[in-house]
Amino acid sequence: MSPETARPFIDIHAPVAQALAAGRPVVALESTIITHGMPYPDNGAMAANVEKIISDGGAVPATIAVIGGRIKIGLSDGERESLAMTGDAMKLSRADLGFAVAQGRTGGTTVAATMIAAEMVGIKVFATGGIGGVHKGAEKSFDISADLDELARTPVIVVSAGAKAILDIEKTLEVLETRGVPVVGHGCETMPAFWSRQSPFRAPLTLYKPEEIAHFFRTRVALGLGGGVLVANPVPENHEIPAEEMAGYIEAAQKAAEALNVTGKAVTPFLLGKILELTGGRSLKTNIALVENNARLAAEIAKAL
């Protein structure tokens, strides 16, 4: 779908439209973290605060979602709160974004769907928590997130805390390399692992300043290389849960998912919910902290572009 033919299906929130028209920095935000990633009311409060962080950082936030079949680029306070309370929202990626629009449905946009919508309107920077990737046991289940293909195809900078730690990070990095997606550790030479600052794997590339990341992206665009850039930004040290501790929680959550035969799109929300329970709420606090940290960096990158 080209941007021109997509416009009749898109509603751009007035502050976002004004910023785009004036060439001011805009940062996209996804909405599955609202609809599927956190319980209410934490999800709504988190989303509002992340938008404020981006605004305070000198950029305009644009939370992306599908509401009643309309692709929303930026939400009003009422729309954001209503989405946070929606119990039956779809989880939308490239495969079902068009379905939700055609059927008048409401859904949270994954990394992939958010990248698509952002690129349609010219937003080049997007802050999220963690990307999807290769699930553990994918050699049997073939459960690999569409986020990875979208990163290879859509020219958007995605600021994350790496891949979600419930995934097979090593295989996720291998797929990203195969698909030609640059993975940049922000100020780190080791890949972060979502709730934890370090994983056993090296960051393929390292840059230290938002201006360097912006320059790298502009250079890729000028060279016609296509696709996005994944920025891996470690969670602040005072909020991390060490990887050794998280490993036990993740293993227990995965065993519970297997016992209940949880599959497909239900896997990630189930695992996140189980880990929230096992950590006594600590994982949620860390998740919120890392999203806020990514929003701050994304605002700086957007200003540098």
UniProtKB/Swiss-Prot annotation:
SUPFAM superfamilies associated with the record: Indigoidine synthase A-like
GO molecular function: hydrolase activity, acting on glycosyl bonds; metal ion binding; pseudouridylate synthase activity
UniProt GO cellular component terms: cytoplasm
Catalytic activity as recorded in UniProt: D-ribose 5-phosphate + uracil = psi-UMP + H2O
Binding site for substrate: K91, V111, S145, A146, D147
EC category name: lyase
Reported cofactor(s): Mn(2+)
Name this protein carries in UniProt: Pseudouridine-5'-phosphate glycosidase
